[in-house]
Amino acid sequence: MTSHASPASPSRVRLDFLDVVRFAAMVFMVQGHTLDALVRADQLDVTAFPWNLWHALRGLTAPMFLLLSGAVGCLVLGRGADGRVPARRLLHRAGWGLKLLALGYLLVFPANRLADLRWLSPDVWRGFLQVGILQLNGLLLLVLTGLAALTRSDRAYAAWALGLGAALVLATPFVARVDCFACLPEALAAFLSPAHGSLFPLFPHGAYLLLGVGIGQALKGRSRDEALDRFLDICDFGGAAALGLSALLARGLPPIHDATGLGLAFTFSRLGFALLLMGLVARRAPAFAGAVAPLGRRSLAVYVGHLLLLYGLPWIHGVAQARYRSMSLAEGFATVALVGGLTFGGVAVMDLIQRRAAPLNALLRLSTAALLAWALVF
């Protein structure tokens, strides 16, 4: 081992409490998307209690996912004796980044066929190119893959990621003043600014994933119990520090209201509450790890599955297309149970097929890819 390589660490331990936290975030995400898409506004008024609290908590799911994605990505990053990440692993990560980008755009594909894209109006193109959480994840995975290739230790990798994350947070108010769409193509500007409807622009949302890399580095190489203790310390002290900084910047107590979502005080407030909520769930993780941790590892499948059920694709109608914000609260909760059951149940079945029927799993994947290609072309 060279002097630049990370110290040898024990064999990798699965930190199941991270999977439990991710599962909790998924449950809240599914019910949040479902109720928001289907329940009438007069029965779900996010300006009045208790739905204003529910709406604020919904805003924490994305930071939680991004923080956990960064942490897990760091935990599974392996290096050779010379400190380098093997080329095959780098290519695999880059491939995943491109797949996430493609999947993010596919879920909002605005035409029946690729050939029909030429007929789209500028407004439809603008909606199609809005950046969601999958596009943000894909871009940052490509960035972190490049960073992993350039660094020679996990410590350096995490330090650069933390530095970039801090830079994104601090630069957000300045980037918000720039008309990115006047000087960049729509597809690129949408990654930088929410002005045309992007829900997860790089500034500041990318910072959560990059800061998560630092969490992963703090847990790496530790036993499960040691890692859990360290994680709880990070969530408690980091959350309190972020909320304190938010209060200083806003000259008032969090939660901070910010209609744009781009202010420093709001970003630190959201980070602080997300960390505290993650710590709260992690404390209860040992009681539920055996039951829910396996599903927590399939966050991408759950995300895609419930969106398909709700919103469909150009060739498949979802529930929201027929009942958009027209249900009662009781009907909405019943649909939450249905969508959640089908999503998590479907993921569990697919996991079972993958483990016990590899040929069938390969056939299903190939068939899905072939049907998708046929739909896009013909």
Located regions from the model:
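Alpha-helical transmembrane segments and their immediate juxtamembrane cytosolic regions
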Residues: 2-378
